[in-house]
Amino acid sequence: MMQSSPSNSRELKTNRLGCDIAVIGGGLAGVCAAITAARAGSQVVLVQDRPVLGGNASSEVRLWILGATSHMGNNNRWAREGGVIDEILVENMYRNPEGNPLILDTIILEMVVNESNITLLLNTAVHDLEKSDADTIKSVRAFCSQNSTTYQITAPVFVDASGDGIVGFLAGAAFRIGTEASSEFGEKFAPEKASSELLGHTIYFYSKDTGRPVKFIPPSFALRDITKIPRWRDIKINDTGCRLWWLEWGGTLDTIHDSEKIKWELWKVAYGVWNHIKNSGQFPDAATLTLEWVGTIPGKRESRRFEGDVMIKQQDLVEQRQHADTVSFGGWAIDLHPSDGVFSAQPGCQQWHSKGVFQIPYRAMYSRNIKNLFLAGRIISASHIAFGSTRVMATCAHNGQAVGVAAAICAKNELQPRDLLAAPSMQELQRELLRIGQYIPGVALVDEKDLARTAEITATSELKLSQFAPSGETMPLDASWAMMLPVQPGAMPSVEFLLDVSAPTTLRTELRLSSKPDNHTPEVTLVTQEIKLRTGALIKLPLKFDVVIDASCYAFVCLMTNPDVAVHLSDQRVTGVLAVKQKFNRAVAKSPRQEPPAGCGIDSFEFWIPQRRPAGKNLALKIDPPLAVFSVQNLTNGFARPTNQPNAWVADFSHEQPVISLAWDKPQTIARIELSFDSDFDHPMESVLMGHPERVMPFCVREVMVAIPAKIPVLAGYHNGNGSKSSDTERLIFQIAENHQSRQIIRLATPVTTDALELRLVAPGANVPAALFEVRCYSDI
């Protein structure tokens, strides 16, 4: 028993924590920053003011995670973000293809608690801080409502990933709220005058079918007059969860201090919409539906944006400007919403895409006036226009990974964020990011510690792509289609399609390229041919192109719309080769061709996008000469996804169990092997609501054996042996079974010293040859 006598006052219990890095905010940006920093060796305290991690992606809000892939609705091919956010998305696809947000919660929590270097504080809100001088944070104070404990967290480096920027605000970091005038940054899409208008908050709901009639009596605060929503006719019975993104409000208010007011208005709207669905009589199929869940906190879009040493602007996105300090990338559209949200008569959003992904500079990821403060998430240094793209969660997470590694370097070397701009430090940061799977457009990994770079690498086969064999299935040319073929400088190969023609007709074909080799927007037409076709089945269509390709790139061999023609398809798939259709995805575009308002500084171009599986098959064709772009040299070229080329070694279709061999001039001690697989970076892997037909991507190699081949000397340390001995039989040193991830790190319990290694892979399927982007070997664990 405990008794306490009366007292004038009491103090809360206080826990004092010291760490290398304090990360405030447990959304995806904070989570990815914390994990990458912890894996880099830093002691991290992760402070989250909610009971779960994930922010807007969590079960509290239930927004799907998206980024540069943009629902596969733009021309950003193979643009899913890499690193930790990729691990999360791929693991969620494997465990949770149905898109249950509760399962996603567990995956994110598991990844954090599995890191021994992270101390996680849930339900803990930062409310105060202490500074050691005017521009340096010493510690933050936070309160946990669940255990009535105050935490004082001291660190040399802080990461503000809190969404509203609580640490930056308390520290006095420069920030802004609202919309800049076009004159400030020369942004043609910005308004003439600055304003306080913002994007608003959103609350979603889920419904389910009970199989029996269910009555709904709305709460007194529900919106009764549905016509107050100008777009009330857009309400659909099947819309649920984040498909209701347009139920948005609050952009004309203070989206920080008025958040509770905004929440109540959004509850009013959400229950009013459901009342309309249930009780208006317009949706008879809703009789057996009931509400399953309504959000209790709003998903926030915009509030403070903090100022770094540079502010990302419209031109950085549209013109794809290059930055020496690039550490991340974006690719979502400039996606802005009317500030009145659901009560606006305007469309719920306007989305304007770039022709490809854009670099994000490191200088936008730290405060310009608080020396030891990193910025992560939607608060990074960007104009309101650029924020329209950089705000989405996968982009925020990818940026957070850059911040996490940078913070770890700073903590280890007693540096401040700005110190990493010096060339050697920036190269180290980029190198460390690329090592962990981060994609930085245009930057290749050059890793002096990688022993594979000095090995002679061979394989039992390399694909020379001469055809996609026809399956017997055909597809009418109800739209224009193209095969994206990776070509090298020199004469363009000829191709031959297989057609069925229902009536005499003339088919238009085109050969197109992108104006930039790393882009996949086919706006440059090199050759146009009008070919007369007779009626018949299995008609061969040979196409020869008298053109020379100047640089390694993807060529689009296009068959334009013709209702009298059907093209034969193939069941074969190959890493880095796709068929694309000239169409649009209504989720992110209004028409097959983007036509922005004149003078707004945004490009016009066509969308050529693939179909999702189980559709999305390649067009059957022959290629002469075969494409020889899948060699083992790709395994050490520094790129771990398709860019302007596939960047993958691919085995021949006939080799079900190909072998990659590494040989050195002298024995090497190997403790760690890293492999990069094809988890289909073109797939957005939407995390919730949208179900997916696959748990493992069809290109992903599931089984790998790592062995020391026979007749190779094996030196001390292998299998606890003493001295040198010779192996007459193959020695299996590691085996991967049922892989589904993009990356696997093999840490050998006992390092081996050898002058040869073999990787034995099993092809994912009869119609998909084995492929690998990277193999790296290291002497350290």
Model-derived segments and spans:
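Bacterial carbohydrate/catabolite-sensing allosteric modules
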Residues: 495
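Beta-sandwich interaction modules
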Residues: 534-551, 561-564, 732-757, 761-766
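Conserved N-terminal/central alpha/beta ligand/cofactor-binding core
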Residues: 8-13, 18, 36, 42-43, ...
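Beta1/beta-strand and adjacent pyrophosphate-binding region of the FAD-binding site
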Residues: 15-27
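Aromatic, loop-rich ligand-recognition surfaces of beta-strand-rich domains
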Residues: 484, 498-499, 504-519, 641-728, ...
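N-terminal Rossmann-fold NAD(P) dinucleotide-binding loop
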Residues: 30
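Flavin (FAD/FMN)-binding glycine-rich loop and adjacent Rossmann-like elements that form
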Residues: 11, 15, 56, 132, ...
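PGST-rich, cysteine-poor low-complexity/disordered linker and tail segments that act as flexible spacers
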Residues: 576-653, 659-660
